[in-house]
Design a protein with these regions (language model features):
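Glycine-rich FAD pyrophosphate-binding loop
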Residues: 20-44
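Short acidic-hydrophobic surface loop/beta-edge motif
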Residues: 40-45, 85-89
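N-terminal Rossmann-like FAD-binding beta1-loop-alpha1 element of flavoenzymes
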Residues: 2-27
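Mobile amphipathic helical/loop "lid" adjacent to a hydrophobic cofactor/ligand pocket
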Residues: 60-197
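N-terminal glycine-rich dinucleotide-binding loop that anchors FAD/FMN and/or NAD(P) in oxidoreductases
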Residues: 41-67
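Short, intrinsically disordered, charge-balanced linker/junction segments flanking boundaries
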Residues: 199, 203-210
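Short, solvent-exposed loop/turn segments at secondary-structure junctions
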Residues: 10-11, 32-34, 165-166
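Glycine-/proline-rich flexible loop or hinge segments
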Residues: 47-56, 126, 194-199
Length: 210
């Protein structure tokens, strides 16, 4: 049978691999490269070449069992990855990272009341999400959810929106229109609202180009 596959992201390529064992496959791709969200850029730095993933970067065994099995089937080597989060807002006016020490790496944060307001809402967000599964209404976007639950602008603009934008490679303005239920369910499933338990992240050795 002749089968056409539209798109060469992981879904298209994995389907092509399996179906090609018994059928004739043709892949249609609008871009000049295969891979979709997986894209490794090589940066030449003096005598060293650094490989940087611009899209797909990490995965974990808990949330991506099919991907883990697929990589194992292809004999793709993976390694442990260190996942961290840091923010630099308004040309360095506010800077912090996820560790306790990193929170106050910028010494003026000790005396910044707005910073403490953000931290208070981060704690409330973690507890609220873990205990009540966020209590999100149907068809409610992230902006409406944050307003309804009285989360501060400091928490939204300097923590949740930057983190969400980084995860989905999406402009900050668009993140606010995301369905709150989908976004917050992702946070819960990936244990991003758990202070103590975090998933063990892995990445493809040599970049997703492998």
């Amino acid at each position: 049978m002749k089968i056409a596959i539209i798109g060469s992201g992981i879904s298209g390529l994995s389907a092509a691999l399996i179906l090609s064992q018994k059928h004739q496959i043709t892949i249609f791709e609008i871009n000049k490269r295969y891979g979709g969200h997986a894209n490794t850029v090589q940066i030449n730095n003096e005598n060293t070449t650094i490989k940087v993933d611009t899209g797909f970067i990490v995965f974990n065994k808990l949330n991506y069992p099919n991907l883990v099995g697929f990589l194992k089937y292809l004999n793709v080597e993976t390694i442990k990855s260190d996942m961290s989060f840091a923010v630099s807002a308004r040309d360095g006016e506010l800077e912090y990272s996820g560790s306790l020490k990193g929170m106050f790496a910028q010494k003026k944060n000790y005396f910044n009341l707005k910073f403490y307001k953000m931290l208070k809402d981060i704690i409330r967000f973690f507890i609220f999400g873990y205990k009540y599964a966020f209590n999100v209404r149907e068809n409610e976007n992230l902006k409406d959810y944050l307003n309804r639950c009285n989360f501060s602008d400091e928490f939204a603009n300097d923590h949740l929106i930057p983190m969400s934008s980084a995860i989905w490679s999406c402009p900050e303005k668009e993140i606010l229109t995301f369905p709150a239920k989908n976004l917050l369910t992702f946070f819960k499933n990936h244990q991003l609202i758990n202070f103590l338990i975090r998933p063990k992240w892995r990445t493809v050795k040599g970049g997703s180009i492998q």
